[in-house]
Amino acid sequence: MSTLTVGDTALPRESRETMVSIRDSDSTTTVLGEDSASTTDPNVSRADGWALMPQVKEQNEREAESGFKRRELGVTWQNLSVEVVSADAAVQENFLSQFNVPKLARESRNKPPLRTILDNSHGCVKPGEMLLVLGRPGSGCTTLLKMLANQRLGYKAVQGDVRYGSMTAKEAEQYRGQIVMNTEEELFFPSLTVGETMDFATRLKVPFRLPNGVESPEAYREEYKKFLLQSMGISHTVDTKVGNEFIRGVSGGERKRVSIIECLATRASVFCWDNSTRGLDASTALEWTKAIRAMTDVLGLSTIVTLYQAGNGIYDLFDKVLVLDEGKQIYYGPMTQARPYMEALGFVCREGSNVADFLTGVTVPTERKIRSGFEARFPRNADAMLEEYNKSAVKADMISEYDYPDSEYAKLRTEDFKQAIAEEKAKQLPKSSPFTVDFMNQVKICVTRQYQILWGDKATFIIKQVSTLIQALIAGSLFYDAPNNSGGLFVKSGALFFSLLYNSLLAMAEVTESFQGRPVLIKHKSFAFFHPAAFCIAQIAADIPVLIFQVTIFALPVYFMVGLEMDAGVFFTYWILVFATTMAMTAVFRACGAAFKTFDDASKVSGFLISALIMYTGYMIRKPEMHPWFVWIYWIDPLAYGFDALLSNEFHGKIIPCVGTNLVPAGPGYENATTQSCTGVGGSIPGRNYVTGDDYLASLSYSHGHVWRNFGILWAWWALFVVVTIIATSRWKGASENGPSLLIPRESVEKHRQHGHRDEESQSNEKTSTKGKSEGVQDSSDIDNQLVRNTSVFTWKDLCYTVKTPSGDRQLLDHVYGWVKPGMLGALMGSSGAGKTTLLDVLAQRKTAGTIQGSVLVDGRPLPVSFQRSAGYCEQLDVHEPYATVREALEFSALLRQPRTTPREEKLKYVDVIIDLLELHDIADTLIGRVGAGLSVEQRKRVTIGVELVSKPSILIFLDEPTSGLDGQSAYNTVRFLRKLADVGQAVLVTIHQPSAQLFAEFDSLLLLAKGGKMVYFGDIGDNGSTVKEYFARHGAPCPPNANPAEHMIDVVSGSLSQGRDWHEVWKASPEHTNAQKELDRIISEAASKPPGTVDDGHEFAMPLWQQTVIVTKRTCLAVYRNTDYVNNKLALHIGSALFNGFSFWKMGASVGELQLKLFALFNFIFVAPGAIAQLQPLFIERRDIYDAREKKSRMYSWVAFVTGLIVSELPYLVLCAVLYFVCFYYQTGLPTSSDKAGAVFFVMLLYEGLYTGIGQFISAYAPNAVFATLTNPLVIGTLVSFCGVLVPYGQIQEFWRYWIYWLNPFNYLMGSLLTFTIFDVDIKCRESEFATFDPPNGSSCIDYLSTYLQGLGVSANLINPDATSQCQVCQYTRGSDYLYSLNLKDYYYGWRDTAIVALFVLSSYALVYGLMKLRTKASKKAEE
């Protein structure tokens, strides 16, 4: 069979002008001239029917007339093999097993074997050709597309040759914007609108040289943007946010289309599309394929596509097909020959089947059908299929194409391509640059987008600024009107420190934002939109006005309320220093986020970093008192330079009088300044009752001469971290596609290995769909006998559902009716937005908002109390506890949802029945995990169904889109399971997204909805859809002979074939509608006259609350036990903070200065809370989302059990954290080591672990999402820290706050108990510099001169030399209790009093978790007659 390789699909259909030398399959050289390039009309395309085809041709002709060279490449690859580290099953360590060092060391020596994910692939896609790559998940389709898109990072080994035109893969790297891949994920900034997203993409791809007749770059961009939006039918979404799971925006299908047109905006020459029709209905998917076909034909693109569930209409638009199985290429050749080739091997393509599904199903025993006479000789697995293909004539024909890159034609096309790209690029760019617009324009466009992102998420921005203003007012009132004497020194220093601290804490959000935007940036980098440096500079440019505003609204209230120096120069110096420090700290955290691969690592480091920088600012530990082993931190700390400059700016040139306990002696009779001196104030000079600001600064090793030096150093640090950010951002890489790997919990490893060993022994040479069965597995009939039979009839009538929107009430369901009987498999279908999921949610009582009218009945009676747990509901999203194994998830559901009268053993036995039914034996002991690290999409779907089945649903089972995102075989498997359930008497109602004809035929009845939830058909489907076909044919829309009836119906009702006809009215006027309503009334009355099929036990939950709590708590404890990342991060935070704190405050003595150091050492313990809460909250909210999404709605267990489980699961680790912090911190600080004191401190630390956990959990319990929680944390923790009596002592707190918030603050009692136990009994020994030294008057002795003072104001002072007549030395305090008295801690019993109050606060914080969770739990809506 000789096939000419330059035909109507081999070369572009326009501008064929050069001579070309190519071999045909007989290896003879054929020279083709311009006119003989094709035997067909080059202007004819299989996509000529596409509405925008004329526009594509017009654009192409305009470019040709403008003298533009064509950008045609083609892709050829040979002997392409890819290896990855084999990760078929990774072991998930638990908290204890991770410390089994000998075992881990033994296992680490066994290097994981390499797995070939793509094996010796070959092919050629010339300009103007489309290749369809088919294969089941894990067969290597995505890997092949990544290789052809020249994205090789993350793979262990890549061998073989890939050529782009005549270029090698290395040469093609500089043209990465012309060889692009659209991945399966939709990665966007959700707060941008569709229009803004497309503005950004199109602006960065406007060519330098414009076609004739185009007025400006903006006109070109606007025209292209309009064309792209029209091409996918989403022009109406231009002002709608893209959105995501948290931010409401366009629908899932529309978001996928935005992803498609953003990729098309690159104007590339080679496109790789990875499952780009996922989430689109068949009509839209076909339109997309036609669009790609049209552009490929006219523009000479090379298009490679991989699809799941491709209909025949889509399949027929391709030129070539490549089929992969286990990485092996079992077919590559013309699309028209693929089906005949497979049929010649003995496989049968069922009538009405999708050919694409047939091609991928030939190696799956449960899917394939063998032609009579071929049973003994058909190829049974991938190796046998490959062997057959290697011998075939198809391969022999295709080999001739592999010379294409060396042909004269390819070389000329490649030269034209290079010239065209050079003309498109801005002249300022270097020749090797992959970008289109120059660097300055990239920055401008990125700055515009940054502001759009901010404006799009106004709520977060406003919350941030309002909380800044609130915090500024609180801080200003806390440090209000600080006096200009020694009493105000500490208060003013605190206010200046807080000015830097708060803005630095806000800057920590940069770490989170870095990871939120990273996937989008990596995608845009692969599209060659902009250089990462442009993105980083744009972020900074966008920061400046925002931070100016933020710093201003913080600085103004704080500065003037505190009463800092009323001098314009001093104020503006303060403002610019706070701004410069904030910019530097923003750069620090942005660099920290950019430098790490995972958020866990970045958050761990940033949390530790902020602690270190705060501690070494110079506020807690003064510069002269820092230990030499950590003093280097001071020199690299931007906060330290800022704090030095702020204090120098404020106190320079001032005279600071000493007052109160800082002045010795003081009071009546001691007015002579020459016999007074200052104590407890740095820089004091004997015999002087004041301190100069510059002496005070010198005592801290500060100087006013450093102010502008430090300002310069701050900007130097800023510049350094910006450079680090740019370098780190430039090195960001996308994750490699290694395929999902199973996770085996350590405690199940042996069982899994034994299971795998049995599998290997029983394995035959034929690949099976199931690797093994559970012990004592029963055959199909035994399983069927054990399944629960349903005898109840479920009906709904005149169902309407209305929701309130800003524009008024909106009706989503309009008088819908229907029924599901036992043994019936019902399909619920309709186009996107028709209300399929809404109807299921209403029927299953899952709605908590809106108004529902109509009747929903079981056996003609109102829904029983137990309905939500008696009916199974498999939602579209597979929501599961990731750290549970499959068996545990099923057992959890069975134990909680089967009736309380059923023995436990019987419930667990039924789990085995369902595991056998759903063929889950080989994954029963693996963790569910998350998508990509755990079960595959199809396996997760089966687990979702299993979780509902084990509950023995006695009424019916709802399933929402169970086949969405699955390949054809997995979808067929899923529906086959559902058919099996219906056959044994279950009632099943399923929403399904465009099934193949084969799947459609499995259903018994159909409810078809149009936009607005209007019914257009309800009734039997008939044999192979005959009844439905007959209905539509009778009303003027006959189904073509080979068309899929399911696709045809959607097209007729709401797609290209609707022709504006109102099918809802057609239905209402039909006899089928009248008969269905009569039948419904008959079913209801008949069912109501009989005893109910389901007996209501009257319980909302199947199990009593106590048993619910035990089962839920056990699961939650096991999940935390296995979540080593979370536990290790918590422990590392405590150990790291404790060691750092302990060594920073090493062996403190008993001087007055060291008393203050002890205060700060204990105060620092409070700061483990922000880091620990930041780790705890996402986990709490993730579990709450699982509970809200599925477990609450199915009445599995009460919210009380949920909260109890979460609280109890944390307790063992909180005890461990307290032990580790205490041991690593306490004994190196010089605090009392006696068991009564140390034991009391440990007990208080243990209570604090519970206190901050309770605070973190009650914020999480009510927060709508994790972002809100992270914005709330600083306000709550910041307020508690501010008013606990440390930053401002009790006596100096303003009266407004002092009499309520101080006493309601748990941190006040925490610090009170810790200080009392550690300082109360200490004898104070002043250092030489701390004494007040002066000469008594008239030669009197010190004791005689000071006797009145020591009995009055100086009662706590300690006179060292009472008999001396000169140089009297007075220490400010005698014992620790004297110092604590100034902090409102008046007796030792205050320690235990405060401990008891902290314990009450712990209980109160946990009570708040229950209370706020109860407040958040809404009741489901019921239908109103």
Curated annotation (Swiss-Prot):
Localization (cell): Cell membrane
Q: What is this protein called?
A: ABC multidrug transporter atrB
Composition bias of kind Polar residues appears in 27-43
Q: What Gene Ontology molecular function terms does this protein carry?
A: ABC-type transporter activity; ATP binding; ATP hydrolysis activity
All copies of the ABC transporter domain together span: 96-351, 788-1037
List, alphabetically, the PROSITE patterns matched: ABC_TRANSPORTER_1, ABC_TRANSPORTER_2
Q: What are the inducing conditions? A: Expression is strongly increased in the presence of cycloheximide, imazalil, fenarimol, pisatin, itraconazole and 4-nitroquinoline oxide (4-NQO).
The cross-references to Pfam families, in alphabetical order and at most eight, read: ABC2_membrane, ABC2_membrane_7, ABC_tran, ABC_trans_N, PDR_CDR
Q: Does the keyword Transmembrane helix apply?
A: yes
| UniProt organism field | Emericella nidulans (strain FGSC A4 / ATCC 38163 / CBS 112.46 / NRRL 194 / M139) (Aspergillus nidulans)
Question: What GO CC annotations are associated with the protein?
Answer: plasma membrane
SUPFAM superfamilies referenced in this protein's UniProt entry, alphabetically: P-loop containing nucleoside triphosphate hydrolases
